[in-house]
Amino acid sequence: MEAHLRPLSAAALLLSPAAPLPTAVAASARRASPGGRRWSSVRASAGGGGWLSGLLGGKGGGGAPTAMTVTPGTVKAGDPVLHEPAQDVAPGDIPSEKVQGVIDRMVAVMRKAPGVGLAAPQIGVPLKIIVLEDTQEYISYAPKKDIEAQDRRPFDLLVIINPKLKTTSKRTALFFEGCLSVDGYRALVERHLDVEVSGLDRNGRPIKVEASGWQARILQHECDHLEGTLYVDTMVPRTFRIVDNLDLPLPVGCPPIGAR
C-alpha cells in the first residue's frame, strides 16, 4: 500500500531514481502444469527476465522506465502472482535464509517506494507474508484533517507470516487507497475500522495485532493481496482516478468519504 506523501507531485514521486536491485535475490513462483503444480525461479536481478523485464521497460525489457513501472522491485497488476491465492509458509522454513531474505527484500522495497505496507506476492513470491509500517514522517506529510479523519497513528515495523484477519466491529469507512502494484492511481475503498490479525513473526513466534483506523485499513489491504485480490477489485469504480486528480470532486451519486 502506498504512503500518501502529498507535498511531492505524482511525477516527482513516480520518477524518483530507482535503487539498484540486489543480484542474489531469488524467489519461487508457482505455475500450473498438466502434471500438477511446479515451481520455477524468478530472479530479481538486473539481468533477470519475466516480470523484471517488464519493470524495466517494454515487453522485451529493452525500453526506458515509464512513470507507470518505476516502483523498484514490485510486480504490477496483471501478473498472475497478484491474482492467485498465496501459500502458507511452513513454520520450520521461517528461519531459513530464503524466507528471511524475502522478508528483508520486502521491507527494503516498501521503504524505498515509499509505502506503508507490502505483501510477498508484490515482489513475485506467492507466500503468505506481509510487512507494514507507518512512521511519523510519512504521516506528517498528510493534511491534519485527513490524519484525524483516517485515525492515522504511527506504528513500528510489523512482519506477519500466515496472517489470519477477522473484523472486530461492524464499523466501516470509505477512503482513497493506492497500491505499489497499481502505480499512479487511487480509488475509494470501503474497509472495516476495527480488525484483529494473528500469525507468526519473523522469528516464528505467535503474534496478534489489534488495529483500528488506518492501520486496520493497511492490514486489510495487504491480507487481500494474499488472497489474490487488489484494491481495484473492491473499489467504488466511479472514483478510480490518477493521483493528479485526487482532489477533484467525486462523481454525482458516489458515497461520501469517511466513516459510514
From Swiss-Prot:
GO terms for cellular component: chloroplast stroma; mitochondrion. Its main location: plastid. It is found in: Plastid, Chloroplast stroma. This is Peptide deformylase 1A, chloroplastic. GO terms for molecular function: metal ion binding; peptide deformylase activity. Its cofactor is Zn(2+). Inhibited by actinonin. It is an enzyme of class 3 (hydrolase). Residues 1-43 form a transit peptide. It catalyses: N-terminal N-formyl-L-methionyl-[peptide] + H2O = N-terminal L-methionyl-[peptide] + formate. PANTHER family: PEPTIDE DEFORMYLASE (PTHR10458), PEPTIDE DEFORMYLASE, MITOCHONDRIAL (PTHR10458:SF2). Homodimer. InterPro entries: Peptide_deformylase, Peptide_deformylase_sf. GO terms for biological process: co-translational protein modification; translation. The active site is at E222. CDD domains: Pep_deformylase. Binds 1 Zn(2+) ion per subunit. Pfam families: Pep_deformylase (PF01327). Removes the formyl group from the N-terminal Met of newly synthesized proteins. It comes from Oryza sativa subsp. japonica (Rice). Residues 182-187, 227-245 are annotated as: Dimerization. Substrate binds at P114, G115, V116, G117, G178. Belongs to the polypeptide deformylase family. Keywords: Chloroplast, Hydrolase, Metal-binding, Plastid, Protein biosynthesis, Transit peptide, Zinc.
